[in-house]
Amino acid sequence: MQQRRPVRRALLSVSDKAGIVEFAQALSARGVELLSTGGTARLLAEKGLPVTEVSDYTGFPEMMDGRVKTLHPKVHGGILGRRGQDDAIMEEHQIQPIDMVVVNLYPFAQTVAREGCSLEDAVENIDIGGPTMVRSAAKNHKDVAIVVKSSDYDAIIKEIDANEGSLTLETRFDLAIKAFEHTAAYDSMIANYFGSMVPAYHGESKEAAGRFPRTLNLNFIKKQDMRYGENSHQQAAFYIEENVKEASVATATQVQGKALSYNNIADTDAALECVKEFAEPACVIVKHANPCGVAIGNSILDAYDRAYKTDPTSAFGGIIAFNRELDAETAQAIISRQFVEVIIAPSASEEALKITAAKQNVRVLTCGQWGERVPGLDFKRVNGGLLVQDRDLGMVGAEELRVVTKRQPTEQELRDALFCWKVAKFVKSNAIVYAKNNMTIGIGAGQMSRVYSAKIAGIKAADEGLEVKGSSMASDAFFPFRDGIDAAAAAGVTCVIQPGGSIRDDEVIAAADEHGIAMLFTDMRHFRH
């Protein structure tokens, strides 16, 4: 049964006023009486809408600089009153039923994100009356509609029109779920903020919690259910953070192809985050979360051609990311040359999409252009817990490198070293990357021994007929022994970039000097597990 409830009276009190005037106009035009508070009431009155201030309705003024506005029995009685059960007591106390509550909360997250935000500023942006009304209306969803998202305004008006001025129980229940999600996320933000400011409460520690709150509350919104997870016997879904601004796989728009799989999303994230490191036209090809070919070029077609040559076998069924618009010529080269699961780029031309559309299994995503990376947190689930760390946004420039060998790198070796250092950051540890002329020529990933990663990189280069002589090699972490340098020298590497920091650095540097290799220390590690 639909259990419709007519909407005759609505209380509107919003911080984010986007769309509220139009929504209020639509409600008023349908005979809905409007109650409102503070700035919302003033805005509606300025637009010529008939609106009753809550203070006039309750007979009690706003007080304490607006801290107390709606905390009154005539407001909450009107929201919580059960139709058909509490009518007599509502009439006795002159409480009018409120059929719809439209509320969004003080911008706490935006406030504390501002540079120089004080604790006092944060406290004043903790909404009290708003969440109370939201929870009251959500609790009484059998009779009251609670609206916390402006994106629902149009659909609500359409349903009111389709149901002779009423909303169905199904809609009210869905709105109530959104309301509880909204207040849960809001309280989580406050708890995280305050939790990061207090001393640790376990044991005798007096240290401040610092970057990480003592209780971590996370809020993610389900974007899609999936056919299965990493393997077919695992169920899965994709959740995204709310209000993410940075271009990412989470914010990307799929413009073509069938639904993304769990592994598609994970691999696309790896490819996109890697290609973001480059300012020049770049292409990254990823397979099983590891780059198998990366290059920069004069155009994305040139970059793709060079990236593909690194490892054509692994590129089959891979993910391809670009940092420029996907054009028709590049799209044609991809489709003609290989099977690809996903292509992601800031944008795609109409001509390119016509070409990729010929292959129904090709998924095309556009993510928009990106600017500066946004600091955030990375999570790794372990059984019974969660590891949390800052995103690895670290990178070094030429001026920060230390040459620790007798021989200085040539200009080309230095360029290649910086190039493959960027790539190594996105290769699973132990990671070794060989590069020459701004393209990868061999990648050794995920080996338990660093020397074997170095050997694999050399084998891959040899298999594809790519000349290693004169190339640069990047290692994501220090060399514990000289054997990795010996393997690189045997392959033809002439420049090495690595963090340094081993107790055997002297031995490793001596090996480089023996082979005439230039070695650069970054003093920064990029483990990736």
Swiss-Prot record:
The organism's place on the tree of life at top rank: Bacteria
Residues in MGS-like domain copies: 1-148
GO terms of molecular function: IMP cyclohydrolase activity; phosphoribosylaminoimidazolecarboxamide formyltransferase activity
Keyword presence, Ribonucleoprotein: no
Pfam families per the UniProt record, alphabetical: AICARFT_IMPCHas (PF01808), MGS (PF02142)
Residues where N6-acetyllysine is found: 287
Enzyme Commission (EC) number: 2.1.2.3, 3.5.4.10
Pathway: Purine metabolism; IMP biosynthesis via de novo pathway; 5-formamido-1-(5-phospho-D-ribosyl)imidazole-4-carboxamide from 5-amino-1-(5-phospho-D-ribosyl)imidazole-4-carboxamide (10-formyl THF route): step 1/1; Purine metabolism; IMP biosynthesis via de novo pathway; IMP from 5-formamido-1-(5-phospho-D-ribosyl)imidazole-4-carboxamide: step 1/1
GO terms, biological process: 'de novo' IMP biosynthetic process
Annotated keywords: Acetylation, Hydrolase, Multifunctional enzyme, Purine biosynthesis, Transferase
HAMAP family on file: PurH
Protein name, per record: Bifunctional purine biosynthesis protein PurH
Gene encoding the protein: purH
